[in-house]
Every structure is written in structure tokens, then in C-alpha cells.
């Protein structure tokens, strides 16, 4: 079985940086931030072998675009699998207690417009 290449998009990197800053400076817990980021990255690395074990998001327009969700403790990792090149694109990493549908609608607004 081939492994998938993991591509972390600039948006996902920005999410990780925002998370790091929030935990490090707002919560004053830099060691916790390091552990949290490492954990999320290790979960993302696990997508190399079986990314399709995670379900597609049921709601549109994300479902028809192949967007999947993986939970990493208190965070939702959104990604899609690009079979043609055996790649997994990590799109966003969002704290699960936030308004996920609202945030996704904002971040993926261009998906609705492209139809």
C-alpha cells in the first residue's frame, strides 16, 4: 500500500501558529502549546497511511468537495485526499468548541461561488 504525501496548506499553518500563540501567550502555557502542536502534527502524520478512514463532512458544499474531518483532542482537522497524486491536503485546524459551521462557511465561501 502506497503512503500519501501530506501537504499542510498555508491556512492550516496559520491555524497552528494562532493556536500556538493563544496557548503560549494568552493562556501563559508555552509547554502545553508545544505538546498540543506536536500531538496535532503526529495525528496529521498518521494520515499518510489511511486518510479515508475519516468520514466526509455530511454538509454541503464540503461533502461534494471531498472535505474530511479528523479529531485531534479538542481540535478538528479538515482535509481532502487528492488520489491522482496520492496527496492529503490539510486545509484547516479549528478548536472544536468554536462555531465550526460558521467558520467553515467563512473560510470556504468561494466554494459556493464557484458552482
List the predicted regions and their residue ranges.
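Basic/aromatic recognition patch in beta-strand/loop cores that engages polyanionic ligands
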Residues: 50-87
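Basic, Lys/Arg-enriched alpha-helical interface segments
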Residues: 1-64, 109-115
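Basic side chains
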Residues: 43, 53, 68-69, 92, ...
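Enriched for short, Lys/Arg-rich terminal
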Residues: 27, 72-76, 80-115
Amino acid at each position: 500500500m502506497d503512503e500519501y504525501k501530506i501537504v499542510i496548506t498555508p491556512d492550516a499553518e496559520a491555524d497552528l501558529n494562532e493556536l500556538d500563540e493563544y496557548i503560549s501567550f494568552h493562556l501563559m502555557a508555552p509547554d502545553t502549546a508545544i505538546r498540543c502542536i506536536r500531538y496535532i502534527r503526529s495525528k496529521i502524520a498518521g494520515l499518510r497511511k489511511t486518510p479515508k478512514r475519516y468520514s466526509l463532512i455530511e454538509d454541503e458544499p464540503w461533502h461534494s468537495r471531498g472535505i474530511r474531518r479528523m479529531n485531534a483532542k479538542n481540535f478538528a482537522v479538515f482535509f481532502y485526499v487528492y488520489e491522482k497524486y496520492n496527496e492529503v491536503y490539510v486545509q484547516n485546524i479549528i478548536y472544536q468548541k468554536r462555531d465550526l459551521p460558521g467558520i467553515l462557511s467563512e473560510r470556504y465561501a468561494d466554494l459556493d461561488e464557484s458552482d
